[in-house]
Curated annotation (Swiss-Prot):
<keyword id="KW-0539">Nucleus</keyword>
<comment type="function">
    <text>Exhibits ester hydrolase activity on the substrate p-nitrophenyl acetate, in vitro. May regulate DNA damage and repair by regulating HIF1A degradation via chaperone-mediated autophagy (CMA).</text>
</comment>
<feature type="binding site">
    <location>
        <position position="269"/>
    </location>
    <ligand>
        <name>Zn(2+)</name>
    </ligand>
</feature>
<keyword id="KW-0378">Hydrolase</keyword>
<keyword id="KW-0862">Zinc</keyword>
<feature type="binding site">
    <location>
        <position position="267"/>
    </location>
    <ligand>
        <name>Zn(2+)</name>
    </ligand>
</feature>
<dbReference type="GO" id="GO:0005634">
    <property type="term" value="C:nucleus"/>
</dbReference>
<keyword id="KW-0963">Cytoplasm</keyword>
<dbReference type="GO" id="GO:0005737">
    <property type="term" value="C:cytoplasm"/>
</dbReference>
<dbReference type="Pfam" id="PF08925">
    <property type="entry name" value="DUF1907"/>
</dbReference>
<protein>
    <recommendedName>
        <fullName>Ester hydrolase C11orf54 homolog</fullName>
        <ecNumber>3.1.-.-</ecNumber>
    </recommendedName>
</protein>
<keyword id="KW-0479">Metal-binding</keyword>
<dbReference type="GO" id="GO:0006974">
    <property type="term" value="P:DNA damage response"/>
</dbReference>
<comment type="subunit">
    <text>Monomer.</text>
</comment>
<dbReference type="InterPro" id="IPR015021">
    <property type="entry name" value="C11orf54_DUF1907"/>
</dbReference>
<dbReference type="GO" id="GO:0008270">
    <property type="term" value="F:zinc ion binding"/>
</dbReference>
<dbReference type="GO" id="GO:0016788">
    <property type="term" value="F:hydrolase activity, acting on ester bonds"/>
</dbReference>
Length: 316
């Protein structure tokens, strides 16, 4: 795996982050409640994580990047969760987030929804990740458990990951209803932090539920585009978009400011227990939507295998 760069994030207190998020969310949602609380047991439904919490030595890893997918895919870009955990100094880490599958592993392109505890010196990896692909039969979304497809812990091209020891502890609980603004849930929180902290980059990771309503998600086709995808319009024409139904469980990573590492500032992938999942864009039912999330700031940023030639296409 290629070069790794790292830096420290600005880490405000949980109480201070609560205050900043609340003031920003109130501009975008009619009902807002943001508090510091004990992380719920995430091994329980609907999350079913392999660990109980989001705490302990928190960090964010931005691996690869969109330039390895578009304009043309770099199928040689294959990464491994266990290797990433070691590179970020946290073997055995719990890792959540959003990325792409390895074509070498699955023989297709698909969305990867990360929920995996990396291997340690004494334990094997516990991979509870999901894969969302386009059903070749009818074009619908097909959601599968990663372990039903493959026993490895690889991924490809790009990912945005939050890693921690998976311990219980204090987290930020965000509960909002009825969207009255234009920003999606994650963008609103990210922009709130950016407005307050400026170039002091704050990184956040966590999980949230879309409890009520519907949301626009996309799933990448199984086959990579035969033609170069040179613009956002090209990319959107290639992707498959869906209106998906709550409840959705969403794994999210966002950073308030890019301190010069060519970061993807936000990336969220969702899964469900009713067969739907993919890349989150925004809710489509503002009057009835309801979100409930649990988040924790990251202490460190790791940038792994940053593309040398970059662009801003396909980063929504």
């Amino acid at each position: 795996m290629a070069e790794t760069e790292s830096c420290t994030f600005h880490v405000p207190s949980l109480e201070e982050i609560c205050s900043i998020l609340k003031s920003g969310l109130l501009k975008n949602f009619a009902d807002v409640n943001v508090i510091v609380t004990e992380c719920p047991d995430l091994t329980k439904e609907p999350f079913e994580f392999p660990v109980k919490g989001l705490c302990g030595k928190s960090r964010i890893a931005d691996v690869g990047g969109v330039p390895y997918l578009v304009p043309m895919p770099r199928l040689d870009k294959v990464y491994n969760v266990n290797t990433v955990a070691k590179k970020i100094g946290l073997p055995g880490a719990y890792i959540l987030g959003a990325g792409a599958t390895s074509h070498r592993s699955l023989g297709m392109n698909a969305e990867l929804i990360f929920s995996v505890q990396a291997e340690s010196t004494s334990t094997l990896a516990v991979n509870k990740s999901y894969v969302a692909s386009v059903n070749p039969g009818d074009g619908s979304c097909l959601l599968e458990k990663y372990r039903d497809r493959n026993n490895d812990n690889d991924f490809g091209l790009l990912s945005n990951l939050y890693a921690c020891e998976g311990k219980p502890g204090k987290v930020i609980e965000v509960s909002v209803k009825r969207r009255i603004g234009q920003d999606n849930f994650v963008s609103c929180m990210r922009k709130s932090l950016k407005e307050h902290y400026g170039e002091n980059a704050v990184g956040m990771g966590g999980t949230f539920l879309i409890k009520q309503g519907k949301a626009k998600l996309h799933v990448m086709p199984r086959e990579y585009s035969a033609c170069p995808l040179n613009t956002d319009e090209d990319v959107n024409g290639w992707l498959k978009f869906y209106d998906m139904t709550a409840p959705l469980i969403c794994q999210s990573v966002f950073v308030s400011h890019d301190p010069g590492y060519d970061l993807r500032l936000e990336h969220t992938h969702c899964y469900s227990h009713h067969g739907e999942g993919g890349h989150y864009h925004y809710d489509t039912t503002p009057d009835t939507v309801e979100y409930l999330g649990y988040f924790h700031p990251a202490e460190f940023l790791y940038r792994i295998d940053k593309p040398s030639a970059t662009h801003l296409v396909g980063r929504d």
